[in-house]
A protein has these predicted regions:
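Short catalytic helix/loop segments, enriched in acidic residues and glycine
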Residues: 21-40
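Beta-barrel outer-membrane channel/assembly domains of diderm bacteria
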Residues: 13-16, 38-45
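Short glycine/threonine-rich catalytic loop with a Thr-x-Gly-x-Asp
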Residues: 29-32, 247, 269-280
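Conserved N-terminal subdomain of the carbohydrate kinase-like
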Residues: 49-136
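Positively charged, low-complexity intrinsically disordered leader regions
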Residues: 1-21
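A short helix->loop->beta-strand "cap" motif at the edges of active sites that frequently abuts
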Residues: 154-161, 233-236
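Conserved phosphate/ATP/ADP-binding segment of small-molecule kinases
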Residues: 172-261
Length: 280
């Protein structure tokens, strides 16, 4: 079975209990999360061999995160122990019409301070068939962006399949900064994943007559987006998620997919969510 490596940040997740607001909370439930870490965990639970590449502080907090990663059967042999701190995020679960709220405390985290030429990519990728990254890691810092590019180039040179979830985060960077960084990375990507906002903010590609902030989804409009992405960046496969928010706990979800120019529209599913964060 193919082995997948992901590169990114693991954060300690501090969630309010019983859907309390952050301002009400007297204590928080601690766990761990992160876009690329979540992918590694999910794949591992499906029986896919995985490796997670990150940087953790060399202290008890970093040890706790490392043990958590290992607990899911994920290969941790390429994790660096460096830097001063593990990033945090505070989570306020949504209720009814009140959306979930996330507050980040991740500045100067270990992964943000990672430098090029510190990971031996030939060794890290020696048993890897697929490399996955997201737009979150290069948004953390200039050096994290440089390491992401370094990893992506190495994977491509080694004949490894490369996938990218664009995952635009407005709290981390502007569309202008995102495009300046993400467009060069796309040269090495075989498979792209995202939604309509990701395509517009990260790559400057938008659906005709579609407002990405309206919440109204028109699958036909995204055929043009898929064609533009294929033409401009040469992706072999592209997946765009289509999500309609009904409430904090109920969404309609579908997807549109391009496989070498052949476009497929998925069925729409009504989903009652147990935990929205990390659900894509």
């Amino acid at each position: 079975m193919k082995k997948v490596a992901t590169l990114g940040e693991i954060l300690m997740r501090l969630a309010t209990p019983n859907k309390e607001r952050i301002l009400q909370a007297k204590n928080f439930d601690a766990d761990y999360g992160g876009g690329e870490y979540n992918v590694a965990v999910s794949l591992s639970q499906f029986g896919v061999p995985t490796k997670f590449i990150t940087a953790l502080p060399d202290n008890a907090v970093g040890d706790a995160a490392l043990y958590r990663i290992r607990g899911f059967g994920i290969d941790t042999t390429s994790i660096l122990r460096q830097g001063d701190r593990l990033g945090l995020y505070f989570l306020e679960h949504g209720a009814a019409m009140r959306a979930s709220k996330v507050v980040y405390d991740r500045a100067k985290s270990s992964i943000s301070d990672i430098k090029t030429n510190t990971v031996d990519w030939q060794k890290a990728f020696s048993d890897i068939d697929w490399f996955h990254f997201t737009g979150i890691t290069p948004a953390l810092s200039k050096s994290a962006a440089e390491v992401t590019l370094e990893a992506t180039k190495a994977a491509k040179e080694m004949g490894i399949t490369v996938s990218a979830d664009m995952n635009y985060r407005k709290n981390l960077w502007s569309p202008q900064d995102a495009q300046a960084t993400m467009k060069p990375l796309m040269e090495y990507v075989d498979i792209a994943i995202g939604n309509e906002e990701d395509a517009e903010k990260c790559l400057g590609v938008s659906a005709e007559n579609q407002d990405v902030t309206s919440g109204e989804l028109n699958p036909d409009a995204y055929r043009d987006v898929l064609n533009k992405l294929s033409d401009n960046f040469g992706f072999k496969k592209i997946g765009i998620t289509l999500r309609e928010s009904i409430s904090a706990s109920d969404n309609n979800w579908s997807a549109i997919y391009s496989d070498n120019g052949n476009i497929y529209v998925g069925n729409k599913y009504s989903i009652h969510m147990v935990d929205r964060v990390g659900g894509g």
